[in-house]
Amino acid sequence: MQADKVKVAILGSGNIGTDLMYKLLRQPGPMELALVAGIDPASEGLARARQLGIPTSASGIEAILADPEIRIVFDATSAKAHVRHARLLREHGRIAIDLTPAARGPYVVPPVNLGMHLDAPNVNLITCGGQATIPLVYAVSRVTPVRYAEMVSTVSSRSAGPGTRQNIDEFTFTTARGLEVIGGAHQAKAIIILNPANPPILMRNTIYVLPEGEFDETAVQNSVAQMVADVQQYVPGYRLKNRPVIERRATPWGERPVLIMLLEVEGAGDFLPRYAGNLDIMTSAARRVGEVFAQHILKEVAA
């Protein structure tokens, strides 16, 4: 291992793992991709890794545990598999960055709370909808208390694989919980829509935020703009369609000002198509989390 690099591995050679591989090669930062491990020796992801000269294995997590120099593991398998992986990785002193819905560790959104969990052995990236919308709800709640937040995420049917389709309930529950726990909303709701349009649409999100009362509109607008800029540092295709709109509406809590934000996420096109911004924001967030963890490890070694 290079002195200024931390060895990392990707567990899972499907679309998510493969896109993450390309991101780590394009922007390695303080990370050295030492292994891509899967369980299907004929998978396209492992074949692509071999073509790029990256060590591969079809032995799954056992191959990762066999290399004591691997410090960080990106788990892009399934929630069921990660339950087992989380235990084994913890026992072997490895850091797990979980891209599945398993949530065996704390929820993490890079520009919001990553710095609070740098000593955690396992962190979870929630959902694509959570990574997209939690930063904006948090941008409001850090200025004024938020009574209620609601997000509607519309993604292309082509970007929603069998895992997404089988876990719709988990998606809505986990995303809503993230809007509350990290976003700062007292109560939240999440909705996902799969759009079969062709050509495929980009990921689009509508976020409604209901503050507790009157608030400083300029301060909120500035906070949202800063948060968008923060996310764009690792997801360049993350953008608001227009400035947040503030309308007075009748709500279950009486007439209140409601903040409405329209967000679009375009992927980088590393491996997944650009319309799959919902998947790209997960792999982009994972790369960013890995980068910060690696920096933290190197600082501890140097201390």
UniProtKB/Swiss-Prot annotation:
Binding site for NAD(+): S13, G14, N15, I16, S159, A160, G161, P162, G163, T164, R165, Q166, N167, N278
Keywords: Aromatic hydrocarbons catabolism, NAD, Oxidoreductase
Superkingdom of origin organism: Bacteria
Catalytic activity: acetaldehyde + NAD(+) + CoA = acetyl-CoA + NADH + H(+)
Active-site residues, Swiss-Prot/TrEMBL: C128
SUPFAM superfamilies: Glyceraldehyde-3-phosphate dehydrogenase-like, C-terminal domain, NAD(P)-binding Rossmann-fold domains
A GO biological process held by the record: catabolic process
Enzyme class, broadest EC rank: oxidoreductase
Cited HAMAP family: Ac_ald_DH_ac
Protein name from the UniProt record: Acetaldehyde dehydrogenase
Taxonomy of the source species: Bacteria, Bacillati, Chloroflexota, Chloroflexia, Chloroflexales
